[in-house]
Design a protein with these regions (language model features):
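Small-residue-enriched alpha-helical segments and adjacent helix-cap loops
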Residues: 1-100, 111, 130
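A short, ordered amphipathic alpha-helix with a cationic face
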Residues: 101-105
Length: 134
């Protein structure tokens, strides 16, 4: 039960951070005043795709973020598979463009995997470990 509560609190903190970014930090929605239902339905400008979810399925992105954000200084560790410890930790990106949309990455073909690995500068075998290839 405590793990479920911790997960919900982490997600709520991420959502609140996104709201503060929209209104006060980046200020692209300074007058936003949404109800709880509107927030739940994501009726705000921008999106917050999270690493490991359908629109950003490559869990290895966490290794890049770990270097950029200095995870150890935040008390966050990564497993060899890119999962975060403590479990109730979330990473993602914030996108402010008014027309951005969530989307799911479908089945990834071998040609796409090879091209993606080449663009990332890593081997296809390494990337395959972090993607659901089904």
């Amino acid at each position: 039960m405590s793990q479920i509560l911790a997960d919900r609190l982490a997600e709520a903190a991420a959502e609140r951070g996104h709201e503060l970014t929209r209104k006060y930090l980046w200020r692209y929605s300074p007058d936003e005043n949404l109800t709880s239902n509107e927030l739940f339905a994501e009726h705000y400008q921008g999106k917050r795709p999270a690493v490991g979810y359908p629109s950003l399925p490559d869990q290895s992105i966490n290794f890049i973020l770990a270097d950029l954000l200095d995870f150890p200084s935040l008390g966050v560790e990564l497993t060899e598979n890119g999962a975060m410890i403590p479990h109730s930790t979330t990473t993602g990106l914030m996108v402010s463009h008014p027309q951005c949309q969530h989307f799911s990455v479908g089945t990834i073909g071998e040609d796409q995997l090879t091209d993606y690995a080449l663009r990332r500068g890593v081997s296809a075998e390494w990337v395959r470990k972090f993607l659901d290839m089904s």
